[in-house]
């Protein structure tokens, strides 16, 4: 449920009005009825009566319909990474501030710092285009399980199975989109037991309309992220544009505001304890069916390792950002992306332990084993499921640390490493000569301009040295790449293992360490030059070691885990035929529902279902950027007149939780 009144002009009311946004808290799904993330086309069969019992005054057809306008037509997949909602007949779209953070950062500069000061387009001409950002509407969902499964058999390896699924999925997608401007994807559900085709209409002209300053949109920062109570004005506005005939089109001044099939009405009455709430959106991923073996690996290895690496990355970025205003803008989105799941993994580990998830998973698995053992047919069909999963995790235990470091510290660590890896592939694929080669080089230059716009050599050099050092001291030496022997045998440096010295020399010699050097390289590019480049040689040494030593084991893990999970999930559904199951999130549309309610996280701990502006003032800390409060907001607070946005007690509510 969302409350919004968009400011029409820059006046005294602007700050007051954008503070009136209130959005449902997402962190406490345990409070949601049946804790489900339900596929919208199945709501009528599975959930309609229960939703109405909780207070829904609509039908399932009102929520999801292929032939008529419904709520699904107001829900948008923003760029494939966030959810947004249509809130007007003129293409206006609401999303989270953190979802628009990349766009806000992209348009910010030292002279126009929209991250710090916020941004409001006072006319359509002032709205800011965002190249590459899309807005996709779900057109329809169709169950194609029977068609896909008909092409599969039990004699197939998992690799053969995946190849056949890709083949038949392409055929299904081609048939579904032929003669239309739609795009589609076949997605697997329940561990590869069910398959649905999702058809979308995707718009490519999405313009930024408004966003509050980060002191409101990110109030509380990492400290309050994934926590309650919170007091964050986490919202931003875009507008979708289309061709005059209403079809998707690339950015053009000739485009017009899109008129959606449906948009969500806005109400300003607020919510009360017990009110029905519903979240409609595109959640990325969940692991509801993770076994005890997966929980143990997360707690023992991957979660803490990820947190440790991101701790270091965040610390290095923060030093650079605090030292220079331009660097602060350059790294704002990178810092936010890194910190979001840094905090998530901290909270997840805490939750897994406090809720004794491992023990609960073991109990489910014991029940499953007993059920399978009761019947020879079940033993034949499902008997190997948990054994395969256990075997996979035993193998993965030996390589999980290496794989986590490869992803977090190498490919997502110092940017110069992955950039060199990516550019080598781009240069290798260049046409030999002629117009096509020039066009391809221009495309590389365009991408490079975007990359170096938000790149700071000093920060990245620190990351390069630190990530290599963490890798060296934490990954088993038996899994070390040859590059670490080179670092050990350096002739110079201020200590025996001087990663700073290695980084300094690598950056001094690399063509990727500055825009100037890279564009000089592009005057006569060659893969031979890249293959001698120290940044590229570093990442390839680590990557090749992984491929040679780890990838075979990883392939075995993948095969066993994929098959084991598929059988285990199928068996669970057969074991409990009367239970309603929902599939893990996979960036497809889902609905979850419940009621507004107070939060009781522990003994003698109680929080109201809403927060107010009083909490903002209580949290204010002028010495902590996360809790800075804008002067204008403090002035409004002192006056205390919130007009139509005041609750029954005359206060201004900020967030609520369900």
Where do the language-model regions lie?
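Generic low-complexity, intrinsically disordered sequence content enriched
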Residues: 8-10, 23, 27
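Terminal presequence/propeptide segments associated with secretion/organelle targeting
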Residues: 2, 15-18, 22, 29-658
């Amino acid at each position: 449920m969302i409350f919004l009144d968009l400011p029409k002009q820059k006046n005294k009311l602007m700050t007051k009005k954008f503070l009136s946004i209130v959005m449902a808290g997402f962190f406490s799904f345990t409070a949601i009825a049946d804790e489900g993330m339900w596929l919208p086309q199945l709501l009528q069969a599975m959930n309609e009566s229960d939703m109405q019992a909780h207070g829904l005054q609509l039908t399932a057809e009102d929520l999801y319909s292929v032939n008529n306008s419904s709520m699904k037509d107001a829900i948008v997949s923003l760029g494939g990474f966030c959810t947004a909602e249509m809130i007007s007949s003129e293409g206006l779209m609401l999303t989270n501030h953190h979802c628009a953070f990349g766009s806000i950062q992209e348009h910010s500069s030292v002279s126009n710092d929209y991250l710090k000061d916020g941004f409001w387009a006072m006319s359509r001409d002032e709205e800011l285009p965002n190249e590459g950002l899309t807005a996709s509407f779900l057109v329809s969902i169709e169950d194609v399980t029977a068609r896909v499964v008909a092409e599969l058999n039990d004699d197939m390896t998992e690799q053969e199975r995946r190849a056949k699924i890709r083949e038949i999925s392409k055929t299904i997608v081609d048939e579904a989109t032929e003669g239309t401007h739609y795009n589609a994807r076949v997605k697997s559900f329940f561990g590869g037991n069910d398959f649905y085709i999702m058809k979308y209409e995707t718009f490519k002209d999405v313009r930024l309309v408004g966003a509050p300053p980060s002191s409101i949109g990110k109030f509380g920062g990492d400290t309050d992220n994934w926590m309650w109570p919170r007091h964050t004005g986490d919202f931003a506005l875009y507008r979708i544009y289309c061709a005059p005939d209403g079809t998707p089109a690339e950015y053009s001044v000739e485009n017009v505001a899109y008129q959606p099939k449906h948009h969500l009405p806005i109400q300003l009455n607020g919510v009360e304890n017990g009110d029905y709430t519903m979240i409609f959106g595109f959640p990325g991923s969940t692991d509801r069916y993770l076994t005890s073996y997966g929980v143990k690996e997360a707690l023992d290895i991957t979660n803490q390792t990820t947190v440790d690496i991101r701790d270091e990355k965040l610390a290095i970025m923060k030093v650079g950002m605090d030292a220079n205003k331009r660097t602060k803008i350059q790294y704002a989105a990178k810092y936010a992306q890194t910190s979001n799941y840094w905090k998530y993994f901290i909270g997840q580990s805490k939750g897994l332990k406090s809720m004794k998830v491992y023990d609960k998973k073991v109990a489910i698995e014991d029940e499953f084993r007993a059920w399978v053992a009761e019947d020879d047919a079940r033993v034949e069909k499902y008997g190997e499921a948990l054994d395969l999963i256990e075997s996979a995790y035993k193998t993965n235990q030996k390589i999980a640390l290496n794989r986590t470091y490869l992803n977090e510290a190498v490919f997502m660590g110092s940017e110069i490493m992955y950039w060199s890896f990516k550019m080598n592939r781009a240069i290798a694929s260049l046409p030999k000569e002629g117009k096509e080669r020039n066009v391809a080089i221009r495309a590389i230059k365009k991408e490079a301009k975007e990359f170096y716009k938000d790149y700071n050599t000093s920060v990245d050099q620190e990351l390069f040295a630190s990530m290599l050092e963490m890798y060296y001291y934490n990954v088993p030496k038996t899994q070390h790449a040859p590059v670490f022997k080179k670092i050990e045998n350096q002739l110079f440096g201020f200590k025996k293992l001087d990663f700073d010295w290695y980084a300094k020399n690598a950056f001094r010699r690399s063509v990727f360490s500055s825009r100037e050097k890279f564009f000089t390289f592009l005057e006569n590019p060659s893969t031979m030059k890249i293959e001698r480049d120290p940044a590229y040689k570093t990442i390839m040494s680590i990557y090749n070691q992984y491929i040679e030593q780890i990838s075979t084991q990883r392939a075995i893990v993948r095969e066993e885990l994929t098959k084991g999970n598929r059988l285990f999930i199928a068996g669970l559904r057969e074991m409990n035929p009367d239970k309603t199951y929902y599939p893990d999130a996979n960036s497809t549309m889902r609905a979850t529902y419940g009621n507004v309610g107070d939060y009781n996280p522990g003994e003698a701990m109680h929080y109201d279902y809403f927060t107010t502006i009083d909490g903002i003032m209580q949290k204010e800390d002028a010495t902590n950027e996360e809790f800075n409060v804008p002067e204008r907001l403090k002035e409004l607070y002192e006056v205390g007149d919130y007009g139509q946005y005041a609750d029954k007690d005359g206060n201004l509510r900020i967030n609520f939780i369900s």
